[in-house]
């Protein structure tokens, strides 16, 4: 490897750090320099000169953590971010927490004050090791540079093995500068028994699951982010092809199954499709693959899939039975489990019962009765129209989103491939979408990357336009601008007596077109149907970055919606269009 050509017998801790991450295949990091991490950035200068690695200079450390997160989600590799001590390190916390709850392997490397100053409340000293313990798989403080290579190797192992997640390495300034006789720990040399994925792939559980599938007349596959991480899309397709089982996904599982398929019901849960929610309420067998049974999916938990037996497959034993006790619990990787299950089903194939045909017909009727609707306004454009048109123009794009109404509409109306959907699901982090688009675009420089944001979310990290401009990243930014904190307004309207406390965003709102142009980024304002499609077409064709300020209907609500404390079958906003108003809507089935 190239890095071996510049190894001598005596090296510094900072050299050991960079050499170790390069040995693990890292070619991009996202970071921001500062006092305690300056020795590492000084070393980085030489490594970049040799084209061994490249730092993407973000405008805020939160942007670095989100970019590393999206880099990982879109590639399956470990994303790496750098920050200095104190406020630099604490600025990473939201991004680390986002990665933790969504099981994303990122490695956060922070500078720290020198060892003699730790515990003295030195300038920019913060116990980032302690702060991050609840939101990482593991944290390290490097006390001796001789441990650096081993710690990095362990960190990469921990990030990826078992249920993925973030790891933090805190590097005191003087550790980076200290010289020692360097010997590298190569990738693959580290084995940590506690991080090995547990597995109970016993023939008894697989056999029970197979029998339940063969006996079910109303089965449903409920698929989460664990299946994406496992790259299980091909094996899941085989299972669906064999037994014609309908598929619904979580927000994290979106893209695991062909969204144009007649068997795909789209997302379930609070803002899921009506037919997915009806299906989960009526199924007699729920096959959960890499999903957590979280509150946004289940609604009222004791009424979730209350008619169903449950098979739950997850790599994390802590998730199995946490919220819903399954009849069959299988701890293991989704691909491995479904492969074993499929082999057994093929060897003992029994034609699926005729009742499954009536189950499919029933779901088809729900689709026809309660489709997703795209409102067509006479004087303005709806958010749904923007998203449907964008998807038609960019069918193979990577989509990142922020959090709020636009995120839920995107989940409803965008059809994506596996690992092409990048969104903060568990933590719901506003400001995620723009830096996430940076990470995805750096990972896939020749692919189309689109950031769908809201006017409120966008303002959380809009400084990252500077990063996009600096590196000429051809990201397309679609702002769904309704001049509100849209989801907050919707909840205030529905549950807080229409008291709109601090959710209006008109006063002090920037002109997004001029803002982008100030960074040298091409921008359009889209405010009517006449210029909507042409502006979107021009944006997708343009070779550089583009921002579109899409000024949409202000008071559009995101439906269907399962209200707090209600079951998934008790959705609001799913009434069929009244007679005579059909021309005001376009049906959009997933």
Curated annotation (Swiss-Prot):
Stored Gene3D superfamilies: 3.40.50.970, TPP-binding domain
Q: Where is this region: Thiamine pyrophosphate binding?
A: 405-484
Determine the domain of life of the protein's source: Eukaryota
Instruction: Tell me a GO cellular component.
Output: chloroplast
Give the matching CDD domains: TPP_AHAS, TPP_PYR_POX_like
Q: Report the EC code(s) recorded for this entry.
A: 2.2.1.6
Keyword list (alphabetical) reads: Amino-acid biosynthesis, Branched-chain amino acid biosynthesis, Chloroplast, FAD, Flavoprotein, Magnesium, Metal-binding, Plastid, Thiamine pyrophosphate, Transferase
Predominant location of this chain?
A: plastid
Question: Any idea which GO molecular function terms this record carries?
Answer: acetolactate synthase activity; flavin adenine dinucleotide binding; magnesium ion binding; thiamine pyrophosphate binding
Q: Per the similarity annotation, which family is this?
A: Belongs to the TPP enzyme family.
The record's note on quaternary structure and interaction partners says:
Dimer of large and small chains.
Q: What is this protein called?
A: Acetolactate synthase large subunit
Q: Species name for this entry?
A: Porphyra purpurea
> Gene encoding it?
ilvB
């Amino acid at each position: 490897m190239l890095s071996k050509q510049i190894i001598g017998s005596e090296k510094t801790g900072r050299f050991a750090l960079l050499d170790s991450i390069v040995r693990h295949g890292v070619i991009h990091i996202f970071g921001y320099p500062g006092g305690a991490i300056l020795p590492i950035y000084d070393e980085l200068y030489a490594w970049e000169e040799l084209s061994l690695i490249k730092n993407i200079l973000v405008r805020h450390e939160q942007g670095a953590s989100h970019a590393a997160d999206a880099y990982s989600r879109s590639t399956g590799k470990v994303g790496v971010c750098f920050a200095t001590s104190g406020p630099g390190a604490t600025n990473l916390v939201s991004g680390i927490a986002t990665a933790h709850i969504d099981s994303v392997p990122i490695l956060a490397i922070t500078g720290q004050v020198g060892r003699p100053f730790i515990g003295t409340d030195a300038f920019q000293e913060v116990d980032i090791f302690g702060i991050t313990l609840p939101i990482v798989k593991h944290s390290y403080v490097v006390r001796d540079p001789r441990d650096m290579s081993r710690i990095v190797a362990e960190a990469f192992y921990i990030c990826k093995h078992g249920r993925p997640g973030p790891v933090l390495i805190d590097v005191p300034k003087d550790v980076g500068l200290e010289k020692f006789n360097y010997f590298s720990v190569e990738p693959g040399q580290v084995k940590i028994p506690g991080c090995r994925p547990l597995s109970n792939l016993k023939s008894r559980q697989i056999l029970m699951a197979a029998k339940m599938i063969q006996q079910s007349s109303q089965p449903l596959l409920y698929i989460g982010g664990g299946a994406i991480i496992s790259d299980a899309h091909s094996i899941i397709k085989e299972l669906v092809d064999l037994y014609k089982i309908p598929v619904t996904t979580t927000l994290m599982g979106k893209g695991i199954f062909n969204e144009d398929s007649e068997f795909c019901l789209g997302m379930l849960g609070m803002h899921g499709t009506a037919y997915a929610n009806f299906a989960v309420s009526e199924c007699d067998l729920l096959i959960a693959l890499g999903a957590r049974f979280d509150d946004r999916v289940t609604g009222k938990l004791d009424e979730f899939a209350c008619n169903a037996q449950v098979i739950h497959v997850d790599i994390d034993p802590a998730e199995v039975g946490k919220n819903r006790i399954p009849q069959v619990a299988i701890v293991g990787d989704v691909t491995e489990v479904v492969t074993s299950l499929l082999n057994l089903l093929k060897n003992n194939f029994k034609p699926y019962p005729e009742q499954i045909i009536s189950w499919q017909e029933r779901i088809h009727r729900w689709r026809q009765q309660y489709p997703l609707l795209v409102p067509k306004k006479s004087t303005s454009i709806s958010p749904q129209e923007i998203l449907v048109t964008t998807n038609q123009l960019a069918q193979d794009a990577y989509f990142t989103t922020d959090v709020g109404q636009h995120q839920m509409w995107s989940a409803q109306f965008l059809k994506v491939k596996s690992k092409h959907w990048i969104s903060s699901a568990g933590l719901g982090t506003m400001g995620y979408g723009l830096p996430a688009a940076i990470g995805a675009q750096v990972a896939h420089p020749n692919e189309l990357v689109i950031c769908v944001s809201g006017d409120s979310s966008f303002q959380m990290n809009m400084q990252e336009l500077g990063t996009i401009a600096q590196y000429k990243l051809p990201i397309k930014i679609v702002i769904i601008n309704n001049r509100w904190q849209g989801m907050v307004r919707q909840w205030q309207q529905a549950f807080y007596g229409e008291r709109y406390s601090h959710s209006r965003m008109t006063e002090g709102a920037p002109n997004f077109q001029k803002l982008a142009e100030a960074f040298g980024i091409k921008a359009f304002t889209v405010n009517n149907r006449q210029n909507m499609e042409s502006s979107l077409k021009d944006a997708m064709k343009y070779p550089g970055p583009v921002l579109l300020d899409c000024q949409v209907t202000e008071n559009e609500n995101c439906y269907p919606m399962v209200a707090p404390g209600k079951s998934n079958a008790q959705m609001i906003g799913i009434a069929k269009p009244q007679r005579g108003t059909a021309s005001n809507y376009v049906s959009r089935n997933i």
